[in-house]
Amino acid sequence: MEFYESTYFIVLIPSVVITVIFLFFWLFMKETLYDEVLAKQKREQKLIPTKTDKKKAEKKKNKKKEIQNGNLHESDSESVPRDFKLSDALAVEDEQVVPIPLNVVETSSSVRERKKKEKKHKPVLEEQVTKESDVSKIPGKKVEPVPVTKQPTPPSEAAASKKKPGQKKSKNGSDDQDKKVETLMAPSKKQESLPLQQETKQESGSGKKKVSSKKQKAENVLVDEPLIHATTYIPLMDNADSNPVLDKREVIDLIKPDQVEGIQKTGAKKLKTETDKENAEVKFKDFLLSLKTMMFSEDEALCVVDLLKEKSGVIQDALKRSSKGELTALVHQLQEKDKLLAAVKEDAAVMKDRCKQLTQEMMSEKERSNVVIARMKDRIGTLEKEHNVFQNKMHVSYQETQQMQMKFQQVREQMEAEIAHLKQENGILRDAVSNTTNQLESKQSAELNKLRQDYARLVNELTEKTGKLQQEEVQKKNAEQAVTQLKVQLQEAERRWEEVQSYIRKRTAEHEAAQQDLQSKFVAKENEVQSLHSKLTDTLVSKQQLEQRLMQLMESEQKRVTKEESLQMQVQDILEQNEALKALIQQFHSQIAAQTSASVLAEELHKVIAEKDKQIKQTEDSLANEHDHLTSKEEELKDIQNMNFLLKAEVQKLQALANEQAAAAHELEKMQKSIHVKDDQIRLLEEQLQCEISNKMEEFKILNDQNKALQLEVQKLQILVSEQPNKDVVEQMEKCIQEKDEKLKTVEELLETGLIQVATKEEELNAIRTENSSLTKEVQDLKAKQNDQVSFASLVEELKKVIHEKDGKIKSVEELLEAEVLKVANKEKTIQDLKQEIEALKEEIGNIQLEKAQQLSITSQIQELQNLLKGKEEQMNTMKTVLEEKEKDLASRGKWLQDLQEENESLKTHIQEVAQHNLKEACSASRLEELETVLKEKENEMKRIETILKERENDLSSKIKLLQEVQDENKLFKSEIEQLKQCNYQQASSFPPHEELLKVISEREKEITGLQNELDSLKEAVEHQRKKNNDLREKNWEAMEALASTEKMLQDKVNKTSKVERQQYVEAIELEAKEVLKKLFPKVSVPPNLNYGEWLRGFEKKPKECVAETSGSEEVKVLEHKLKEADEMHTLLQLECEKYKSVLAETEGILQKLQRSVEQEENKWKVKVDESQKTIKQMQLSFTSSEQELERLRRENKDIENLRREREHLEMELEKAEIERSTYVTEVRELKTQLNETLTKLRTEQSERQKVAGDLHKAQQSLDLIQSKIVKAAGDTTVIENSDVSPEAESSEKETMSVSLNQTVTQLQQLLQAVNQQLTKEKEHYQVLE
């Protein structure tokens, strides 16, 4: 547990603040109440009645109970006097009052002596308060219930509490009660007890002085008695003048319990020892002098005697004797007492007024103190809450840091484990490389031994080969059987062809039958067409549908034709396959015939094969070397590309700087434009102002002229008035003058306002001009900077051009390298083709060797095998030397690459330094020279790279030549092999082939290829490990850079926040201190605009001036004391503030450390998370790619299945289409015939239509005639009616004629409508046909 986490720290801060506040107000209240105590001492001279003995007994009983319950806490001890006062105030009304004698008023000299003594004791008390904080809490809390006396807490009790820490709580309770009794003691006791307290301090501090005699104890008892009687309590209330009897009763009620407490305390042994120690050195003479000065009444004397009787029985006789002789003296004392009472009453009246004022001041000060206490409590509460919150945050942050540390340790352990694992892998790889070299040597030796053993075996296996040759003859027989089977298959294929032809014949027959059926149907349909001639309009619609159907049928026919063509192509393919099978059968026959002759040139073929194998292996080695060389070149290209990327990034940075400069220049242009705009605005304003001023000046001149003219007119009018004194004219003139005066005043006011506006506008113009001048200066500065930047930009552009040229060169080099890589890939393809050809040749040679039946001699073959073994050994040696040379080359290339990387890193650092220097200082000649040197170095490097590339090109050209030579040799070998084949066909051999030797050779070759593959895999693993290491280094550098940048950012943020918080905290403390001082000293006024130090100095000077003005008054001293205390409080507060600041600084440092550690770990975790995300993304991409491939394969399978189904479906549809085709052909023919018939019918109908049109014309003419006749008949009827000659027969005939004519007209109209409808239908039909 640290200091800030302990409970002691939580409790200590608020307790210290509370004690300081209470001490301050306690001391302040004590000093302000000193004058009130002097006034109250004068009131104590009044007669105070005492209580009866019964009441004393009851009080003693109550006191015993209180002593038993005295072991209370500090809060209980505070509540005791309040309850006590309330009970006494309620009990006063029912009790009988007995007068008690009062002390005589002290003289002014005694008051001065008392003040001096109190001033001496004040520093002693303050030292006690600062040393004993626990003891000082008790009196600070007991001051609150407004005590009258100014007596401080006795130091003897504090010393006793220090000496006796093991006492019980009852002792503490009794000590608290003693303190309450002493607060109510009279000022006479104060004067006597002050020196006693000093002496008791010395006794308690040293522990040397002790009580020795019983006489001193008796004297101490005598001292306590009058002091108890003298103690009084006078409350500070406004109603003191109205009822003094109640005041006296309250005083008595408060005195009596104190007296009883004093009597009971003297009875206790422990309390007696303390009082003996306090009053040990009091002189008896001083006690007698104090008694002589005091005047007692009879009742008071009796009370004193009763108390003395209770104390000691020996003194009673002496008191009785002295009382008899002093009766006369008492009479004189009574007379003097009456006089004193009169004086005291006057003083009391004065003091009551003073008390009222003091009470008012006390109330105001109490209110202020309560407000201050409330604020301080609120402040303490807020501080405690903030402290708790801060502590919780600290705990949380501490836990988080612990968790992060645990995580960091885990990560570190993981990294260490990974590093150890990588080291193990590197060791394993090194061991594997060493093991492979050892294994190669051991394998080579083992292979030699195996070859020797195989040589011995070959002799034994020759006998077995003869048996194998017999088996081969059996295989030949089996091949002949296979040929017979193929012939059978051909016969079956011919049968199938015949079946297909029969199927086609059947289909043609069916097609012809279908055609005949269609013809019969066509005849039936012709009959139906003749019967359905009236329904031609309906058939036209069906014809449209049929035409669409015909189009579909045509398309289906085309598809069917294409399918038939595909079937024909398949049939042709089958025929071609049959022909190929026949050709193969013929070849087999020729091979069987030629197998009898081929064994003379076997030895020569073996030699040629051995030489070819050597050459092939050499070419393979050279190709492997070229492949390694190309891999190294690819790595170098990658490094160069990385360099290019870095240079491009630097160029981008420089471009960003140039863009920023361009943006700054653009902003400058904008500023210049805005300045020009403002200048134009200013000019416009100036012109407007000048125009307004000129207008106003002209108006002013006009008004002056008018004023002069008016004055002249006034003078003329005055002359006229003097000549002709008419009152009306005079009044009119006066009115005119007044109106013109008012106009002049308004004009003057307008001029004044115009002048004021002109002045304001001139001020605005001046301000705008100043702003314009400042802006022009800024523009000039910016232009100067821009010029500097332009020079820098020109340099940057030159550098960019150089870099661009270098990039072009690098790109050209990359393109050349890519072209070379493509050439190499093509050459590899050619080499693979050559290998395949060589393998084919080997297979042919093997077949030839198998086909050999005879060999010349076994000894020649053995010699050839030995030669082959020697050649293999030579090849292995050459391979070893080549591998060693390649390893050396790789090591040198690796060193060269490392040197290039170091140079690149140095160049990067140099470029960064140059960029920083360019930002700090605009173009410097030294840096330019350095850049030029760097460029020269890069050019030299480019030249080196070009030379290297040229060397590589030369190597490639030489290798290309070698490959061409090898190809030419292969061609020669092919020609020789063909010649050998021909010779073998001509000559037959009877010797068996050596298959086992060929198998051994092939096994050796396979082993060599496997070793080469292992070497390649090991090289790839080493390169992969190097790449991983380089990637890890780059990631570490990037992480370090990110951490440094984040640390800088966080430090800046923390410093800014800490500065702002400190300033706010200091300002808050200063404001609080100012408010406290203003509340304490409201009369002092200091301007608030000053700084805190100047304000404090001014605040110190103002009270001093007030003190100089009121130097004679006692209030000045009190204020000085208050100022001292305030200064002390201020120092204490400053110390606390400094402590808080130190604590805050420590906490801020801890927080910064925590933040740094947290951010570091966060960055590390972020890096790890990014890596994991990248890996996850890669896995996801691979997974998605695999899923896509799976889906693609599924789709392909589905497509294949669909295609199969479609194929089957199409075959079915073909059959259906063929059937439908036959039907459709017949239908088409029928439709053609129908079309021809319809056309003929249409022609006949057109002729008929023309005839009908002629008939219609005639009918219309006839209708016109009929209508004219009708009209004439109607005219005749009208004539007959007029003539009244109309027989009934003629009328009936005319009616019938009219009816018949109407019927004929309606019929003709219906016919016309029908003809029109037919015409419209035929027109539509023609449109459809067209």
Curated annotation (Swiss-Prot):
GO cellular component terms, A-Z: endoplasmic reticulum membrane
Modified residues (Phosphothreonine): T153
Biased composition (Basic residues): 113-122, 161-171
Tissues where the protein occurs: Expressed in male brain, heart, kidney, liver, lung, spleen and testis.
Lumenal side: 30-1330
Protein's GO biological process: microtubule-based movement; protein transport
Membrane topology of the entry: Single-pass type II membrane protein
Transmembrane segments: 7-29
Pfam families linked: Rib_recp_KP_reg
Coiled-coil intervals: 332-1329
UniProt similarity note: Belongs to the kinectin family.
Name assigned to this protein: Kinectin
